[in-house]
Amino acid sequence: RIVFGQVGIDLIAGPSEILVVADRHNDPAWIAADLLSQAEHDPSSQSVLIADDRDFAAAVSKAVDAALKTLSRAEIAGASWRDNGCIILVKDLLADSVSIVDRIAAEHVEIAMDTAPAEALAAKISHAGAIFIGRHTPEAIGDYVAGTNHVLPTSRAARFSGGLSVADFLKRTSIVACTPEALAQLGPAALALAEAEGLDAHGRSVSIRLNRRS
């Protein structure tokens, strides 16, 4: 943030976010651990659970409270969960989750379901920094060992950007060259657009080469 605008940077990321879509067949303690894995970063981090079973959701909430007592960063994680954590209940995970996931556009999305429905749900999601599929794929695997970059868009930026990649460190320069024949083909379209924008000099730079008067 200090040098942003003076030089190119990767992206402005943070606070951390996780959204977990989980059915009732999960161990509540596992899901609680996933939610807290991002809550422990910062009091401003956000952890969201989408579930389709009220009893399971309540069990996860209790598991979060129990797990907090064991964390070295309990104060930070607790403040994050208290102020920014939430549980969203839906009737049908496959039918109702996608619109919520895309609206939140979280940094990390876990789909803790059997592989087939998890993959089906993931295929419908348009906005997420990274998606972790299946009950045995906690977000921390992406942080440390999976090989995917964990510098990801936050604050709903996943709606229009992706994670850090080699492309972010490349500088590209466009090169354009027109022959007289190519200009004769492309020029009229450029003239029409320049006229529509009311930019006379733009149009003249083309028409003067086409031996036309603007």
Which positions does each model-derived feature cover?
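A glycine- and small/hydrophobic-rich beta-loop-beta segment
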Residues: 37, 41, 49-128
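Glycine-rich, charged/polar anion/phosphate-binding loops
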Residues: 3-7, 31-36, 94-96, 116-119, ...
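Conserved NAD(P)+-binding/catalytic subdomain of aldehyde/semialdehyde dehydrogenases
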Residues: 1-48
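Generic structural signal for well-ordered, non-membrane alpha-helical segments
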Residues: 11, 24, 28, 53, ...
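Short acidic, glycine/serine/threonine-rich loops at helix termini
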Residues: 1, 30-33, 59-63, 145-146
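C-terminal core of ALDH-fold dehydrogenases
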Residues: 99, 103-214
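Short beta-strand-to-turn element immediately C-terminal to the catalytic PLP-Schiff-base lysine
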Residues: 21-23, 49-52, 88-91, 133-134, ...
